[in-house]
């Protein structure tokens, strides 16, 4: 079994790690950074990933996709999708299956596809470091992700060419990294406020056992929301001062978003920051500049309610675990937003203790995923991880009632069966509608999917016995079966979200990803070939100008002919042809090199390199070792 990498697929940034010996290690990307922006851009037929995509966002906002994790596994009609539509510069569109997809460069992409591009970058980063092919990974998700979101994340891994051995909850991964080398038993809380989601998990750890007691959260609360508050504040201040509303200017909005993110980070260590955006827009009177002094106090006031929203999940998680805040012996902070002093204050106030800051909040989740990868390929032993399902699972019964089969915070993997019956006489088929959530009416919860059990023998209502079984695997993904006990007929399904990608769509996306990887490689080869050729043309022309008269007419003619042949194909898209002409010119230009060397030798003053024996001085020396 090869190396299993751990990937933190984040809303804002992603990170990849691997076990090296007995320790997990974060792998730096090609740019030398330990995290990679979770941003994809499409420009002039080219796909950009990470930092290169982020750099061009200001000039290409409608084709730059970020924070797609907030859309993954969501239906287009989801209120959270509408919320996102109002703030992102790219188009969110309705897919044929009803899911929320994105549109860029006149093409439609599923959030799983966009996520796959990021995962491919993580995979390549690991392969470049390890020097070997990587095919297996552990990928993290927010603890409060539902089945559809988990399945969509697993699909993203498959599209990226990875076998996803395990989907692991982010707070659980963080706890693994925190407690990996600690023997003492503790009850800890992991407070994870990242770029797009918030989770809190309560765990008991000790002697290599990591047992999640409860988890709660909000899959649409994170740093992106904090950025939006600053962005709206800047727009309002600028409108008040200039009378111009920047909300309809995509380029200005992208600059404002970057400025908001920068200001947010600066205010974690400074109490005030200056936001200067020259030439943000223009009107009939000329260009306009934005120059605002922004204080930490103003920022805290803008986001106070967002921080307060993290408290309720903490209360629920403690209640579900049967604990009080005073029972928590350590609070581990995870996610970039936990660097904000006001967030740390809120955590301290709620739990009554100073939070633990000994882990890097941007890297700890990937490190934990790498440890879990080490467990799966037997590199790490004596670790037992017991996670839970974040939401209750059940089916819709008579009257639209949500009947739970598995309660939230049940340790997984788990299996539960219950017998139901028909609602009408002589009913020959039943539709099983599977929901996930905590509301009493099924319609108020998340519909995961549905299937039919047919061929039930005619009988009065209430007589047939239909056994429904829920099975949740270690990834938190749901499998459901329904069996008529009389006839023995059974229907089994792995729940696919009511939208979701079909197997055929996933396979097509895998092929597209492989094709893109091949085309990306070809494009890189072409660019490298053109760069090498361009450099050779320049140096050859310079050399011919300086030393052409030193060549024989035959050698000079051959060099000039090879030079013309290479220049003629420089704009071609055929890398092999460019390389062939480059090699021909390289061979021809060797004669120029010989002429250059000969000319330089002739120009040296006679005897310059001859040793002058008259000036040689004999030196006396002593062997100090013999003293």
From Swiss-Prot:
Sequence ranges of Basic and acidic residues compositional bias: 612-627
InterPro entries, per the entry: ATPase_NBD (IPR043129), Chaperone_DnaK (IPR012725), Heat_shock_70_CS (IPR018181), HSP70_C_sf (IPR029048), HSP70_peptide-bd_sf (IPR029047), Hsp_70_fam (IPR013126)
Keyword set, alphabetical order: ATP-binding, Chaperone, Nucleotide-binding, Phosphoprotein, Stress response
Induction and repression of expression: By stress conditions e.g. heat shock.
KW Chloroplast (keyword) present: no
GO-annotated molecular function: ATP binding; ATP-dependent protein folding chaperone; unfolded protein binding
Coiled-coil portions: none
Domain of life: Bacteria
Modified residues (Phosphothreonine): 197
Polar residues bias spans: 600-610
SUPFAM superfamilies, sorted: Actin-like ATPase domain, Heat shock protein 70kD (HSP70), C-terminal subdomain, Heat shock protein 70kD (HSP70), peptide-binding domain
Annotated spans, Disordered: 598-627
HAMAP family from the UniProt entry: DnaK
Protein function: Acts as a chaperone.
Family note: Belongs to the heat shock protein 70 family.
Protein name as it appears in the record: Chaperone protein DnaK
Organism ancestry: Bacteria, Pseudomonadati, Pseudomonadota, Alphaproteobacteria, Rickettsiales
Gene name linked to the record: dnaK
């Amino acid at each position: 079994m090869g190396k299993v990498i751990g990937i933190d697929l984040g809303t804002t940034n992603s990170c990849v790690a691997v076990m090296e010996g007995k320790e997990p290690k974060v792998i730096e990307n090609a740019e030398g950074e330990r995290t990679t922006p979770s941003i994809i851009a499409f420009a002039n037929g080219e796909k950009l990933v990470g930092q290169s995509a982020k750099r061009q966002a200001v000039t290409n906002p409608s084709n730059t996709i970020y924070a797609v994790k907030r859309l993954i596994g969501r239906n287009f009609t989801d209120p959270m999708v509408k919320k996102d539509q109002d703030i992102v510069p790219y188009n969110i569109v309705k897919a044929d299956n009803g899911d929320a997809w994105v549109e860029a460069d006149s093409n439609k992409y599923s959030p799983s596809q966009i996520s796959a591009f990021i995962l491919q970058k993580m995979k390549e980063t690991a392969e470049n470091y390890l020097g070997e092919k990587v095919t297996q990974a552990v990928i993290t998700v927010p603890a409060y992700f539902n089945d559809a979101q988990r399945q969509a994340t697993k699909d993203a891994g498959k599209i990226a060419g990875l076998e996803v051995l395990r989907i692991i909850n982010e707070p659980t991964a963080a706890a693994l990294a925190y407690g990996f080398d600690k023997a003492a038993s503790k009850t800890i809380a992991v407070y994870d406020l990242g770029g797009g989601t918030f989770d809190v998990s309560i765990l008991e750890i000790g002697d290599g056992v990591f047992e999640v007691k409860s988890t709660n959260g909000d899959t649409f609360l994170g740093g992106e929301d904090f950025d939006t508050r600053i962005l709206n504040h800047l727009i309002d201040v600028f409108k008040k001062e200039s009378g111009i509303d920047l909300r309809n200017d995509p380029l200005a909005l992208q600059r404002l978003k970057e400025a908001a993110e920068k200001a947010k980070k600066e205010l974690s260590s400074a109490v005030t920051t200056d936001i200067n955006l020259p030439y943000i827009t223009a009107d009939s009177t000329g260009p306009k500049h934005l120059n605002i002094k922004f204080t930490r106090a103003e920022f805290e006031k803008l986001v106070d309610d967002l921080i307060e929203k993290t408290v309720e999940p903490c209360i629920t998680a403690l209640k579900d675990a049967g604990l009080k805040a005073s029972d928590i012996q350590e609070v581990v902070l995870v996610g970039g937003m936990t660097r904000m002093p006001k967030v740390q204050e809120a955590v301290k106030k709620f739990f009554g203790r100073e939070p633990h800051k000994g882990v890097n909040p941007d890297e700890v989740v990937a490190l934990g995923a790498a440890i879990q990868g080490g467990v799966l390929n037997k590199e790490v032993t004596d670790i037992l991880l017991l996670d839970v399902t974040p939401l209750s699972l059940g089916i819709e019964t008579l009257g639209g009632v949500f009947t739970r089969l598995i309660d939230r915070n049940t340790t997984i993997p788990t299996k539960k069966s219950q017998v139901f019956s028909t609602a009408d006489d002589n009913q020959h088929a039943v539709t099983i509608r599977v929901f996930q959530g905590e509301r009493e009416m099924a319609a108020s919860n998340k519909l995961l999917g549905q299937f039919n059990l047919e061929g039930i023998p005619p009988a009065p209502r209430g007589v047939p016995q239909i056994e429904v079984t829920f099975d949740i695997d270690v990834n938190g993904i749901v499998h459901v079966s329904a069996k008529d006990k009389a006839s023995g007929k059974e229907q089994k399904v792995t729940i696919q979200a009511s939208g979701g990608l079909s197997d055929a769509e996933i396979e097509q996306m895998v092929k597209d990803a492989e094709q893109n990887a091949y085309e990306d490689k070809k494009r890189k080869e072409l660019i490298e070939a053109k760069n090498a050729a361009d450099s050779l043309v320049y140096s050859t022309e310079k050399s011919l100008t300086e030393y052409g008269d030193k060549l024989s007419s035959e050698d000079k003619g051959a060099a000039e002919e090879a030079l013309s042949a290479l220049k003629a194909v420089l704009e071609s898209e055929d890398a092999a042809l460019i390389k062939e002409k480059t090699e021909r010119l390289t061979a021809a230009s060797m004669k120029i090199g010989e002429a250059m060397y000969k000319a330089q030798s002739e120009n040296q003053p006679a005897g310059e390199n001859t040793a002058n024996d008259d000036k040689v001085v004999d030196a006396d020396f002593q062997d100090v070792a013999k003293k």
